[in-house]
């Protein structure tokens, strides 16, 4: 009897109940003209309250820049179906380091790269038009970029883009590129690897990278969340490290984000895309004490007020009184905009 009680107690601790939470947005951005899809955030190092939200308008062929009040501060048109977007810090360019925004330009089969001016808070196109093509040699949907996540390698500051596409094979769905500055102050791409298993059901769009811990996560939308090393030169770069998030989802697995905390602590977030009330599944960033790649048990399930969410982004950086513990940004389909959620402490199960 004693052994059975011990085993039952251990099992209960290992499978602690998942918290069910209900969040409402603190604010929202202005609407885009066409169809909002994916957000990113740039943290202003001088004044975090003047940080920027960047969002794609895929049918409006534009990239929007918002302040934290949701006001449009810049619109960049002429981008042929921008699907997803990400931000990275510290690209060496023309003798200085530059923070960048990179978006997939699906109908042009390339990436669009922008420098962020930290003084004017405006974006400037620095794409090398002859060197930004992705999925070269592929055809149709296999050449159409969708998701993107940027990775800055800690040991040398090299910046990479991990890119997903509309369709792809079972074993190399994602391609990874190094961002290489040119003598003329532009940025071109250098392909470094193909990787990423795919179930064959649906597609892979959402990708996220944990810069600090060096992992890339992506959503195989009707199957689960997969994890690899982000460094293409890692000895186990081709090894699938984890598959999780296979249970409980009612809709497609869409946006993915990382909410980092001290050390290796924090959360991995993935959207369960639902009409009117998309849900966010929250997993432990650090895994378990026995296995850092074990993310099977969700910490929380957050019910939100966002409709049919595709892309999400999160930050734990304090952003002033409105967002003292950071925020969660979620695409909101019905209103063609992005919801801003004040991050709230999660119960410690």
Residue ranges and their predicted role:
Residues 29-33, 76-79, 135-141, 195-200, ...:
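Surface loop/turn motifs at the tips and blade-to-blade linkers of beta-strand repeat domains
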Residues 68-109:
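Blade-loop segments of beta-propeller domains
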